[in-house]
């Protein structure tokens, strides 16, 4: 209690930099400015990206494909990365998800329906990278015996985003050049949570690759949108220091239909911003000015955007 008085006192009497961390159950980073009269800089601490994950493993001759498979399954939380076996990783992930994430959100926001919050959280994490509607979630949960209104679902989604479990990503109309306030996507901030709650039957790897690419862009400092075109969508519009790039992310280009889907998404986009397709294919097939990158090369920053 009253920690801000102590911090302000130190700052007034000592020439020091003060770093503050804490649980989301007590204080969100966005509220620090209020407590400390605005004299703060918020630094978002993310799970390891893939390059940091490999550095943490400190293997002299790393097999990047094996490391990526582990990263895609268990994510980049340091405590999980340091665990010796799969069973321990699973236990740690479950403990973080249940004891930290859920309890922090419930305590911080005084949630009076923790079970419904858990169902919303499970849904949003298990459907990372898919378009989400609060109305659809409310309808699904209500039909399964968990009656909840759409406004309550949207409030729970806000709490989940505030707790840094998922990011909400807006759509951007490329032709109209404006952000849209509907059909947002949510991306889970650590792949380990996706592993715990995955519920897809097909195309699972495509969604995992998309989530990895999103988190990599965020770790590099990009502002990210989902692109809306007349034909459909572009996975990501990413902006950093005034530079804009387009990115399509997929598992493998296994046939001509898949190639057309990923490269064809850029059809009729009139601007000249760089356009990329990122997949796990070892051999790349850039075409029509669209650059194809291998995912591991992209994550290890061997290629530039």
Where are these regions (language model features)?
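Conserved beta3 VAIK motif of the Hanks protein kinase fold
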Residues: 247
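Accessory nucleic acid-recognition modules appended to NTPase machines
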Residues: 86-244
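Catalytic cores of nucleic-acid endonucleases
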Residues: 227, 251-295
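Interdomain motor-coupling "hinge/lid" segment immediately C-terminal to the ATP-binding subdomain
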Residues: 23-25, 29-131
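Conserved catalytic/switch belt of AAA+ P-loop NTPases
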Residues: 4-20, 33-34
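Switch/connector loops and helix/strand junctions flanking conserved nucleotide-binding motifs
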Residues: 27-31, 51-52, 256, 284-288, ...
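SF2 helicase catalytic motif II
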Residues: 1
